[in-house]
Amino acid sequence: MALEKIIRESLTGFIQCHIPHADLSALDEVFYAYATGVLEELGSQNSSEEDFEMESFVEMLEAYIPGFSEISSGKVYDMLFELSRRLSEARGKENVSPKPTAEVSFMTPTSSSTESSKKIETEPLEGAVAQEKDDAKNGIDLLLEIFPSCTVSQAQTALSMAKGDLEDAVQIIVDGKVIADNHSGSKDLQGAPKTDDLKDFILQKYMLVDTEDDKKTYRPVAPKEAPKKMIRYIDNQVVSTKGERYKDIKKPESEEMKKTYINLKPARKYKFH
């Protein structure tokens, strides 16, 4: 965090010095990550001014801060190398290991300020220890629920052998690597449950399996047949009520056409008395 603060303060100060009315709100985390990478390259032992790509850096800054390209490249070089030097010094100070707290406590006199600092340091440690205890208790309860014949001491042993990993602890109990505690007076572990029995137990307790549905045979209901249509229509007129698919239709003829027909029937013979 100290290095990031140095980068932010140096870049914002340099920009405000040369562009007083610049909008610094556009500088986001992506920009500072890019600037950090550039400064790390400059701080390396193999880097030099010739290897540094000034044009790409200026284009990047110009996209965030309009008018940055008008600043001379020499000033930008000086600012970057000075900032890189400051960052390397800050890293060197951070890498220096602090003195042990025990020696400092013997050298400095006891006071209210030192006691308050010790309390502040011990509070996070106590919280972490309490969190670890809660996790271990939850893991032991889960192991006892999965393995009813397992004792608390055996669950603690399996969890410690697995270094807190529940899956490894379950595998250790299944393999029978846990030795019964004779001092506690509890019964010996009567062998780890078989894998099939364990699976059945877990499925029965934590999983809903509908076995009756697997035994059923699916028989779809046949669709009902619609009654046969007996009425036939042509041009929205009923032509049949018996359901024929074909029908002879006589075309209507005009009166003039009827006059052209010849009647071939023989004339009637009339008898006169």
Curated annotation (Swiss-Prot):
It is found in: Cytoplasm; Nucleus. Residues 135-178 form the CUE domain. The keyword Cytoplasm applies. Keywords: Cytoplasm, Nucleus, Phosphoprotein, Ubl conjugation pathway. Residues 92-121 are annotated as: Disordered. The keyword Nucleotide-binding does not apply. Phosphorylated. Transmembrane segments: none annotated. One of its GO terms (cellular component) is nucleus. Its main location: cytoplasm. InterPro entries: CUE_CUED2 (IPR039805). Signal peptide: none annotated. Belongs to the CUEDC2 family. May play a role in targeting proteins for ubiquitination and subsequent proteasomal degradation. This is CUE domain-containing protein 2-A. It comes from Xenopus laevis. The gene is cuedc2-a.
